[in-house]
Structure formats: structure tokens, C-alpha cells
Amino acid sequence: MARSVWKGPFVDGYLLKKAETARGSTRAEVIKIWSRRSTILPQFVGLTFGVYNGQKHIPVYVTEEMVGHKFGEFSPTRTFHGHAADKKAKRR
């Protein structure tokens, strides 16, 4: 079920403060965040966030198309190594 419209998008408070200070500074640096559940807002466009995936921070550059999605969607937590090869088919 989707979030109620009257509640508005969820964003952690510290994330808004970090983005605001990054907008004010001239240095382009990665903003490390652990909040994968936060919604990407229009004021985040053009910033780079390091989204934590459980092991390391994955750099995510926010574009217009990402607005409305969650940060966790752009930082995969699992690595797919492919399915195991069939041993019978390999011998032939």
C-alpha cells in the first residue's frame, strides 16, 4: 500500500540539513547517508549521496528522473553471481 498523500514524502531530518549545507558549500563532496528509506526530493537534484548498502557507501548522483523514488532503490544490497552450472551438461 502506498503512503498517504496528506502525510507527504518521508525524509529523515538530518538528511535535509546535510543537503542544505552541501548546497551552500562550493566543494562537491559525497554526502554519506544510512537512510535508504528516505524519499528523493527535488532539492536533492545535482547532489551526490553515498547510500549505505550494508557494506559500503555506493555513490548515487541524483537526477530529475529519481525524484519521488527511495535512495535504497539505487544501492543494491545483494550481489548476483549467476546460477550454478549444471554438472551433467558440463561433462557432455
Curated annotation (Swiss-Prot):
A single Gene Ontology CC annotation of this entry is: small ribosomal subunit
Q: Which HAMAP family match?
A: Ribosomal_uS19
**In the UniProt record, what gene is named as encoding this protein?**
rpsS
Q: What is this protein called?
A: Small ribosomal subunit protein uS19
Q: Keywords, A to Z?
A: Ribonucleoprotein, Ribosomal protein, RNA-binding, rRNA-binding
Q: Which organism is it from?
A: Methylobacterium sp. (strain 4-46)
Coiled-coil intervals in this record? none
* Recorded family membership: Belongs to the universal ribosomal protein uS19 family.
InterPro entries the UniProt entry points to? Ribosomal_uS19, Ribosomal_uS19_bac-type, Ribosomal_uS19_CS, Ribosomal_uS19_SF
Q: What does this protein do?
A: Protein S19 forms a complex with S13 that binds strongly to the 16S ribosomal RNA.
Q: Which domain of life is it from?
A: Bacteria
Q: Which GO terms describe its biological process?
A: ribosomal small subunit assembly; translation
Q: List GO molecular-function terms, semicolon-separated.
A: rRNA binding; structural constituent of ribosome
